[in-house]
Amino acid sequence: MERFAAVDDQYDPDAVEDGVFEYWDDVDAYEQTKAHRADGEDYFFVDGPPYTSGAAHMGTTWNKTLKDCYIRYLRMQGYNVTDRPGYDMHGLPIETKVEERLDFENKKDIEQFGEENFIEECKDFAEEQLEGLQTDFQDFGVWMDWDDPYKTVNPEYMEAAWWGFQQAHERDLVEQGQRSINQCPRCETGIANNEVEYHDVGKPSIYVKFPLAEQDGSLVIWTTTPWTIVANTFVAADGDLEYVGVDAEKDGDTERLYLAEACVEDVLKAGRYDDYEVVEELSGEEMVGWAYEHPLAEEVPDHAQGEGSGQVYTADYVEADRTGLVHSAPGHGEEDFERGQELDLEIFCPVGSDGVYTDDAGKYAGTFVRDANDEVIDDLDENGVLLSSEPGHTVREGQCWRCDTDIVRIVTDQWFITVTDIKDELLANIEDSEWYPQWARDNRFRDFVEDAPDWNVSRQRYWGIPIPIWLPEDWSGDMDDAIVVGDREELAERVDQDIDPENVDLHKGTVDDLTITEDSTTYTRVGDVFDVWLDSSVATWGTVNYPEQTEDFEELWPADLIMEAHDQTRGWFWSQLGMSTAATGEIPYKQVLMHGYANMPDGRGMSKSKGVLIDPHEVIEKHGRDPMRLFLLSVTAQGEDMNFSWEETAEMQRRLNILWNVARFPLPYMRADDFDPEETTVEDLRDDLELVDEWVLSRLQSVTEAMTDSMDDFENDKAVDELLEFVVEDVSRFYIQVVRERMWEEEDSASKQAAYATLYRVLESVAALFAPFTPFVAEQVYGALTGDAGHPTVHMCDWPEVDADLHDPALEREIEVVREVEEAGSNARQQAERKLRWPVTRVVVDVDSDDVADAVRAQEAIIADRLNARAVEVVGADDEWGELQYSAEADMSELGPAFGDDAGRVMNALNEARVTEQSLDTLEGTVREALGEDVDLTEEMVEFRRETPEGVTGTEFTALDGGGVVYVDTALTEDIESEGYAREVIRRIQEMRKDLELDIEERIAVDLTIDDERVDSLVREHEALIKEEVRADELDGVEDGHRKTWEVEGTDMEIAIAPCEADQREASEQASGD
């Protein structure tokens, strides 16, 4: 880019971003930036891998934008940042998408299609989606190593999972066992608790009588899952709860029912009983050992009948709710299973992986379990044990996270990493990480880990990392007799078949056929694949291709930083902790940034399937990449959800337009004056810096310090706020306005050079400060300023550091007062309808604080300039402005009771009174003179009103620890009118210059005709000023040119302008030289 080259008048995101993309490609900006930091301190960032199951949405866009922002920031701080992106390419997220594409309904369709064919389809789909995501992320301006992403389907990554699993096995943390799991009947696989999503469903609510076997009466239970009664094994009671036996009457018949005392009324009401009598009181402990008959014994002949089945036991999960007795089926419910294990009871689960009853379910065999609910209820009724049944009871039901099928809980053989054996180690490792926000670690994450069950790592699916366990045919269940393979080299050495470890595909199609024979025993691989969360759990070492390569792992691990949304406390944050602790005993990450979800503007969650979403491509098309990024980064990244806002994104575009205009403003002047930033620096011109230069440079140091602190604390939103306020308020609305006339000076001067050097330093730093947030516009601004003299890209710049020599907080406080005074003065002008172009005779600043008074006195010149005032007067905190008066508004509700019949006279006197201070004593003296007698006034009786002299308006302000009032005297004098009209003419001529798109150096001739002779005379008094400001050689003699009629303060003015001919300009210059 050419230094100080002209740029477009308006910020056009599309044009800027297209140009910068092309520029980055031309100069290899990303590659050069990485090479520039190659010798810096290593920083190991690990990318949480998104599933390659769909296009980028606003959530992934926010996530990748945050990552890109911090990677760029860290590089600018000198770090050599690992930036390898990752993709989660296995598991149900991919499989279900492929099933949809192939119009499959269940696993049977897959088996008919062929496992290997299905695996190939999944591989192709995942790679296809990966390309789309890569394109999207690059299009958002994200800089990562897109040429070398880690893919969970690659052999070197898959063996990273194998290695971790083998390490866990060597620590005796791997076992096969039965557990109650969440089973998706459509996908026919177990899913983890953290993968279950919940929704409200209506279910039957039934009370059932379990007839006692050895005494009269029945136990009463309540359930919303009638289908699980088929597998009932015991009834649970609370040992300390009070239970009763009641004789309940209905239709003339009496039966004995046992239930919790607190539940009697509600249960009998549900059963429509006429009356009851309590005949027995006992505790839950006293009921232990009571035997009962299975309510579906005839329908399910092979029901649970093992030793101890069909009895009452105590359990911790029982509450005094419904009946106080809980039907328990260890073959289904998790708590039921755990209690059944403690009691060494039979685990009876007559349900297959597809949710269909097996032959063990007797009458119900071949029926999908939920479809059997009505039949079970009918049979219970037919058997005389249904006490009550009502439909539509709303409960939270779990469903598969990928296909939305309601899950069933069944007990199956699964492979587990027994994280419960290392719970203390897990909790201790959490303390070795810093979280942003910290409460996410100390509350949400710690609570989840404390309650985490053993990790079911096996899935009965196809597209995943095969579990590397080989077992003998008659395996005893002892893990010492199992072979767990940790990498490809070991696999090649141990299997019976001849394979090439460098090229072997580790997916099911290959490894299922591999056998191991040792000591005359042949081992075959178990058929399951890993839970897909185990894939990503090894990302910190999989990113650096460990164990295949060891050097980077030994130098970099554990990760310095990871960042994802808050759902990953139950997902990736947990799986990494669990796997790493199991494999290595250590936590795999040092810092965690946990952001929220991306929501719709009204707070609803986004959902592609429901058509409720914001497409990032649509945002880019409407507003551009940088405005979208800036909005996303202006939202806190620490734990809170983000509601997308079109309005705020548009506002970010407007603010970047202000940045654009600020950066564009000095370019033509610097170019015209051949300004050399390397030869003319702020340091070289320290003695020539004006006070406003020193202030803006100090503000730059304060902003840099605040932004650095915020970014180091992962508070990017605060950093954005600091930067935007600086550019919009400090630079655009204040500094540029103050300094522009110095840049317009015809002749070179130390003041002009100081202004150039100051603004150059500010803009160069601002470009660097914007770079992590808005990389495109930052690149454009930096290139326009530096050209070939700077780095090839702004992203190679160092992050700005605070220069203590330029930092003057005291001066900043003084200018803060100036700006508050200016704002108040501008408001007072507006009240008086006096434009800023028209000077005023004076501004009076009446303050109530010595600090504010000192600041105003120190900066009188700037205040006068900013408010276009001929003079500034300061009235100190202990003084009164002698020209100010106060009137008193009387409150008759207070005067009446105090003065009776004289209240009217007192009120009239008060209304006429004028005093010079807000003092009751002074007011009483004035009223005494009017009435000829003393009056005693209170604060409640009157309210003082400030009255300014004619032509003076005032506005209050606050600054530092005080404030005051700014009074503007707008009284007109002939001199003020003369300058005011001249400024109006100047503004019109400047607009006409813009119409002709004249270069700032191009001189013109002006023809001015004013209808009003007096106004014409006033304007002519400032001909020299007009000519200087608009670069006019003369104010007469334009025959053609650009001509316009203006109305100025009620007076018509005809103005014509035309560029001067070269010879005319030369003649003019020669004449002026003579």
Curated annotation (Swiss-Prot):
One of its GO terms (molecular function) is zinc ion binding. ATP binds at K608. Pfam families: Anticodon_1, DUF5915, tRNA-synt_1. Keywords: Aminoacyl-tRNA synthetase, ATP-binding, Cytoplasm, Ligase, Metal-binding, Nucleotide-binding, Protein biosynthesis, Zinc. CDD domains: Anticodon_Ia_Ile_ABEc, IleRS_core. Its cofactor is Zn(2+). A motif ('HIGH' region) lies at residues 50-60. A motif ('KMSKS' region) lies at residues 605-609. Its EC number is 6.1.1.5. NCBIfam families: ileS. This is Isoleucine--tRNA ligase. It comes from Haloarcula marismortui (strain ATCC 43049 / DSM 3752 / JCM 8966 / VKM B-1809). The gene is ileS.
